Swiss-Prot record:
Disulfide bonds join C251-C264, C263-C316, C293-C351, C297-C353. This is Left-right determination factor 1. Required for left-right axis determination as a regulator of LEFTY2 and NODAL. Keywords: Cytokine, Developmental protein, Disulfide bond, Glycoprotein, Growth factor, Secreted, Signal. One of its GO terms (cellular component) is extracellular space. Its main location: secreted. Residues 1-21 form the signal peptide. One of its GO terms (biological process) is negative regulation of transcription by RNA polymerase II. Residues 22-76 form a propeptide. One of its GO terms (molecular function) is growth factor activity. The processing of the protein may also occur at the second R-X-X-R site located at AA 132-135. Processing appears to be regulated in a cell-type specific manner.
Amino acid sequence: MQPLWLCWALWVLPLASPGAALTGEQLLGSLLRQLQLKEVPTLDRADMEELVIPTHVRAQYVALLQRSHGDRSRGKRFSQSFREVAGRFLALEASTHLLVFGMEQRLPPNSELVQAVLRLFQEPVPKAALHRHGRLSPRSARARVTVEWLRVRDDGSNRTSLIDSRLVSVHESGWKAFDVTEAVNFWQQLSRPRQPLLLQVSVQREHLGPLASGAHKLVRFASQGAPAGLGEPQLELHTLDLGDYGAQGDCDPEAPMTEGTRCCRQEMYIDLQGMKWAENWVLEPPGFLAYECVGTCRQPPEALAFKWPFLGPRQCIASETDSLPMIVSIKEGGRTRPQVVSLPNMRVQKCSCASDGALVPRRLQP
């Protein structure tokens, strides 16, 4: 079985390290990049005294402030626990099948999905069938199996998203595993009542040519109705109870921070008026609450580290952030004018326990 971890990505915020406190240098660097400047502009105090922020500029700034509280950047958290869901195989055509999984109440409340694994049982190819296809080279005796998530929209139209794809040999048999974590993440974003999880499995030839033209048709997967349920498609859901392994929310301001403090969000005020580089340049805001993630995270059992060898230790990170709208002064053609900019991922909204290597979920498109 090929490892499933190759498609997992490391999620990194523009902070020095996950959950680390935002510094003035990082804020300055983000602002320079947003304005495509190499250095802080030189502005005279006399120019600033005559500068008036127009109503439409301030309205744009306020609108960005309001929007930033609803449009957040999200990260992925780690988890553990195991559930198995049996699915139905509905044949669409010779090489394409639709898997249907009833998912309601399959994911425990207050839990985080770590990984979803689709297991399909590849049936042995009869020797007579292999003989009819003649002598197949190792390359021509392979087929590509692709798994897509199928979404049925309210208007009845369908949309598919590629989830996983791999090559299988027609000479092999047994269980094949596919990482379908992203499909379950998409399903979780659907509005209620949620439809079943629909996975479309396609078997296609890898190469063109007479030897490979029909080899992919030899790849068959066991369907519902197999003797005693053996070999029917399975969906494994690995989750972690956030009550034991998650963060606690905001830190208790009355409690002292210790090495054993559970991961939490701590207030941290960034005073822009006290930063020399912001003088005469940053008009709004005078400062802001950035927050930082502090504390430690409970580590999963050692057995889990064996299953996911490429995941590092769990740590307290910023899993949801907001942008920071600002009004800055820009000098063009001898005139100074105000301009609204928005710096992404500047304010921590939520802290979570996560592990390096966890999947970054994509947003579900309309």
